[in-house]
Regions:
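Aromatic-lined, polymer-binding surfaces characteristic
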Residues: 15, 38-39, 86-94
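Short coil/turn linking the two alpha-helices of tandem helical-hairpin repeats
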Residues: 33-34, 38-40, 80, 103-109
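An aromatic- and glycine-enriched ligand-binding surface/loop that stacks and positions planar moieties
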Residues: 93-97, 104-263
Length: 263
């Protein structure tokens, strides 16, 4: 930040570059204060042999983060057109506001969290990523969901549930994991590995013999995580599943998969 003015670039670009750096500094301080609480706020370049700096209070660090993000949000552009130094995916005004909303939420400052989040929402630049149709493999999985969920009994729209589930899954896949995705506010792009494959989904999560991949069924959510989610009515916690009911569910799935392998 201190040496940007020495660079050969336009004044406009210098101002924006400083704002980008301040964004990441605030991001770093957010991580630090979440781990350690009180940390030293350093905004100037220090010599190697500088004396030890006293830590600032938690309140001071939090105010610094929220103030920095609010200020850089007024400097950063809403979007980028592409090209050198204007690459799509760089920090935008709404990335700063989104991070500010998250920080304020962590700090228990709900008024500021709502204010910053509403600014992002009202911009109209972002929306949930939604699939409009399913491929053959997804259709098969959707059919198997009836083994787990009685949609009619729970009053759940199966089509919306299934498309919502697969939309969330597809959100992270390579073809959709780009700055062009309407749900992405800030992205970190990297080179993909052509040898990578979806091992976790087909081995650790899927029950044994549920598919030709022979899952391990070793990654399962703890009950505390399950209970952290609301039921379809948005209010009450789900009832505990009894052992006999769990046993019956597993037998139903096992028999279904066994019949598939015999066919």
């Amino acid at each position: 930040i201190a040496r940007v003015d020495e660079c050969d670039m336009s004044e406009e670009l210098k101002v924006r570059t400083k704002a980008e750096a301040r964004f990441f500094r605030a991001f770093a301080y957010l991580t630090l204060t979440q781990y350690f609480g009180k940390v030293a706020i350093v905004t100037e370049e220090l010599p190697y042999d500088a004396p030890t700096i006293a830590r600032n209070s938690v309140e001071e660090v939090r105010n610094f983060i929220l103030t920095e993000l609010a200020e850089v949000a007024e400097i950063l552009p809403e979007s980028y057109s592409g090209g050198f130094m204007n690459e799509i995916g760089r920090v935008t005004r709404y990335a700063a506001l989104a991070l500010r909303s998250r920080a304020a939420l962590y700090f228990g400052n709900y008024e500021e969290a709502e204010k910053s989040a509403k600014a992002v929402i009202d911009s109209g630049k972002y929306s949930l990523f939604k699939l409009t149709s399913l491929n053959a493999a997804q259709e098969q999985e959707a059919e198997e969901m009836d083994l787990y969920i009685d949609f009619a009994e729970l009053g759940i729209d199966k089509d919306k549930f299934i498309k919502g589930m697969f939309s969330y899954e597809a959100l992270w896949q390579g073809a959709n994991a780009t700055p062009a995705n309407p749900e992405y506010v800030l992205t970190h792009e990297y080179m993909g590995d052509p040898n990578a494959y979806d091992q976790y989904r087909y081995t650790y999560f899927i029950p044994l013999s549920m598919s030709i991949q022979n899952g391990y069924s070793s990654f399962e959510p703890m009950q505390d995580l399950v209970d952290a989610y609301w039921k379809v009515d948005g209010k009450t916690l789900p009832e505990k599943i009894q052992v006999d009911a769990r046993k019956a569910n597993y037998e139903k799935i096992w028999n279904y998969a066994k019949n598939l392998s015999e066919e």
